[in-house]
Amino acid sequence: MKRFTTATTDIKKRRILRVVPVLAAAGILSVVLTGCGSSDEEVQRYSWPLATASPEDTVTQIFAEKFAEEASDLSNGKMKIQVYANSTLGGDRDLLETCSDGDIPFVVQNTAPQVSFMSDLAVFDLPCVFDSLDDCRKKIDEPDFYSLISDVYTNGGYHLLGMADQGFRVMSTNKAVNSFADFKGQKIRTMENSYHLAFWKALGANPTPMSFSEVYIGLQQHTIDAQENPYEVIVSNNLYEQQDYVVETNHLPHLISLIVNDEFFKDLPEDEQEIMTEAAQLATEYAREQSDARIADKIATIKESGTEIITLSDETRKEIREASKGVYESIREVIDPAIYNSYMDGIEE
């Protein structure tokens, strides 16, 4: 492990001093630096914050914790990363802003809230692109596509270290969906995302943006008929208790990015950058494995409750894709053509 140069050490000290008020205000200050500005014989040790807006028992948190663990192991304990969950350091938007400023170097979060900051990430809002998670992961890992997406993050002030997932987003509802016509009129809660709203409108549904904290009561009081989320969210928040069906629309992958402030990353010695990259690769593989196992477990929980899981026919999926062409065109108009073409390469349009 290389020792920091004086310039690099000064940068790190300044950054840690900047983040101290943020952590202190939250009552969780744990950043530690020893050996700063001391003799060459002393060892540099440091603890950097990594923040998520997700609860602890989620793939997002598993991804974050595994990255921190691997970074520590690969550096023989010299690189310490402290993970803070449950929006302790802020919500999704807050975390993106503080990461961009360099106050919190690491963030793990879903790509959806990042579209407001980096419009090219709307490529991940293209509906019903993949037939399987394996196909989706192969595309994400494809060198040419990954390079293009990495550039998007770099231009936004971040460095993309890895991208895992929480499976596909699926629909839960109190009205069975066995054909395309069955989507018509369903009051479904969505995120406040124009492309998501347009997708459900194209299916004939009645999408309603709603705070996630209101979804359970909305289903209970029949303000809404349905909602859409990954299996993990549906089970961990007990949404299936208020629903008769889960429909495997698999309309979007729920992608989880691991990002670091770009300037912060570039200031690291080369060997530490390599450790970060390797740790992220290992964490990505682990998070995907955990996601698959947890999805199977969540499906079992839903079935045991009596809620029926409906798998759509190829014909219905084809109708959904056909109805979504307007969404494709809307997204295609606002993102880099190279990104769109790379993402859709090998996909029948």
Positions of PLM-derived features:
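N-terminal secretory/targeting leader peptides
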Residues: 2, 37-136, 153-155, 159-349
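Transmembrane alpha-helix boundary/anchor motif
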Residues: 31, 144-148, 195
